[in-house]
Amino acid sequence: MGKKNEITEYVAAVLVFVCAVAVSLGIFLVCTQNSIERNSQKVIKTNVSRQSEHIKTILDIHYGYLRGIAKEIGKSEELVSDENMEMLISLEEETALERTALIEADGTAHYDNGAEKNVSSRRYFKEGMEGKETLSDPLESSVDKETRVILGVPVRKNGKVTGVLGGSYNVTALSRMLFNDFFEDVGYTLITTSDGEIIAYDGNPAYHEIKYGDNFFEFYDDQTLVCGSSLTEVKRDFAMGASGLMKIRNGNDYNSDRYLAYTDVGLNDWMICYVIPVSEAQKSYNFVRRYELMFTVGFGAMVSILFLWGVVKNRSKNKQLIQAAETDALT
């Protein structure tokens, strides 16, 4: 009887130990996953914020190019001259500006390729004539479907604005360049207004079906937002120009989980967004999961061996007890 109680106590102690280790392992795995989630989200938000600053820096550099040429043009006797048009051609050739134009006070634009057009009704021209550096609303090309904006600076002569110098910049190519090496070029980028109008997009079409002019909030309205995210909060962030991140899912398909990080560009009311599958964002942490799997399998194997050893040991003890009971002590 004493031996039986001893075995029972031993089994109970082993079960308590195994349960304690199993609970600890579960807590460890949950905490590890939460840590991976936080770190991957932090990396995405940090990179999107940096790329937003990069966009402003690049456009500021090109504003600087335009200012320098506008200053030289302001020194000439005539606004539109062969010498000034040659500077426009050089500006287009030496910078990322795809088309440059010198605009007279009446709105007549003289382009570097020799074309002429009246742009007196355009906002960027009106703001330029008011002495402001201006950035136009985005326009999608009917030829290559790329989105471009016009950067404009005033041309001053003797302190008076006599015209506007403008150059077009491909913001689709810019967003592509910024995120080309981000998570091995997986996912896609969006540039939107604070109202959610999509003005530029780029990325692998396997991950999105967005078109120019779509509304950001309408596009994601039928998506499931997880981890406490809501489109109402995102709309508020867009209106305030705040940064944020949400996790989205197609219905109940966990394999479709994506992170969407966004931040203010600091130009007009633009927001830049980056969308990437969660599996890709957490890819660099796969080695942690491999170690977790190895540890879990190893722990399971050890528990199984311990259990089998206990069963064998218990059977051996029972066999010895039966033999002892059946043996005549006097023989």
How should these model regions be labeled?
Residues 322-331:
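Conserved nucleotide-binding and Mg2+-coordinating catalytic segments in signaling enzymes
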Residues 80-96, 164, 168-218:
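Solvent-exposed, extracytoplasmic
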Residues 94-96, 105-181:
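Extracytoplasmic/periplasmic ligand-binding sensor regions of membrane-associated signaling proteins
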Residues 217-293:
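Extracellular/periplasmic juxtamembrane segments that couple receptor/chemosensory ectodomains to their
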Residues 18, 279-321:
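Cytoplasm-proximal transmembrane signaling helix
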Residues 1-38, 297-301:
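Extreme N-terminal signal-anchor transmembrane helix of membrane signaling/transducer proteins, especially
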Residues 42-51, 57-136:
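Extracytoplasmic/periplasmic sensory segments of membrane signal-transduction proteins
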Residues 85-86, 112-140, 206-248:
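Extracytoplasmic/periplasmic sensor domains and loops in membrane signaling proteins
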